[in-house]
Amino acid sequence: MKYVFFIILFFLIFTPSCNNQNQKIEDIFHKIETEDAKIISAEIVNNNTFNIVLSEVVEILEFSINGEENKEKILGKEFSFPLGRTIEMGEKVTIALTYRKNGGNTTRAYFTLYGKNTRKANLLINEVSIKGTKTLPDRVELLVTKSGNIAGFELTDDLDSTPLTLPSLEVERGDIIVIYWNSKTNKEDYIRENGKHTYFLSGNMANTLISTTGALILFDEHDGTIVDGILYSDFSSSDYGKDKYEKCETLLVENNEWYGEPISSEYVTASRVLTRLKGGVD
């Protein structure tokens, strides 16, 4: 009995505990290690199909699009799931996927993807109002330099926060898009004297733009390419917004989108804005 007790005690001491949260499990009898299968790629193709590739064979246990679940079990490494319809350019789709590797853990993965914009316009940040009031709120003006669609373009003043995503809108070269950053506007679009359109969009962002030292970056899609950006500062000693500014500055400089000092915001008021083209675009 003493020998039996010693063997059981040795097994309890030296057997590693199993925790469902562990990403790696070791089989102490066969020395076989298993890890969760890794996601190699995940994308929307032709705006009607979700494709995903994993590092090894798994069993799909559940798949959902915008909360609509499909629990048909499928085995494989590469999968294509129809979205049920062709989504709009720039339209957001939330996808959840539950899969299990043979002998491994069950993994739940979430994706936020957007309908691909196949006719991208070219845009520039033309004016920025950073000291808005109730009657003249913060605004961002974009100038269209090439005709196309603005669906899925993203504007952000903080790389750690949710960006502003532009809706599907067909625009022509020379058109202007005025975005009321953290408010709603009821202004109607109109045609200027030169025949070009001015469009008004409600941003409804949670916070105003920083009125002292800040940045604004424009991407052509979610996690996409930087197409424009600005840095501005009143050159005060205040640390307010400094972390946000420095992260944006680093990204713009590393991508050759900014050189030298930021634009001075010292004399900006509610009616005096940061502008690219003196006197406007007309």
Task: Locate the predicted segments by residue.
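Positively charged n-region of N-terminal signal peptides that target proteins for export
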Residues: 1-4, 20
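C-terminal motif of bacterial Sec signal peptides marking the signal peptidase cleavage site
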Residues: 14-17
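A structural motif detector for short, solvent-exposed N-terminal "entry" segments of globular domains
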Residues: 19-33, 40-47, 105-161, 208-210, ...
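Residue-level recognition of beta-strand termini and adjacent short loop/turns
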Residues: 46, 75-77
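Buried hydrophobic-core signal for structured, non-transmembrane domains
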Residues: 50, 138-144, 214-218, 274
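Extracytoplasmic/surface-exposed domains of secreted proteins
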Residues: 50, 54, 63-65, 79-105, ...
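Short, surface-exposed alpha-helix to beta-strand junction/turn motifs within ectodomains of secreted
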Residues: 51-73, 153-155
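Solvent-exposed beta-edge/loop recognition patches
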Residues: 86-89, 168, 172-282
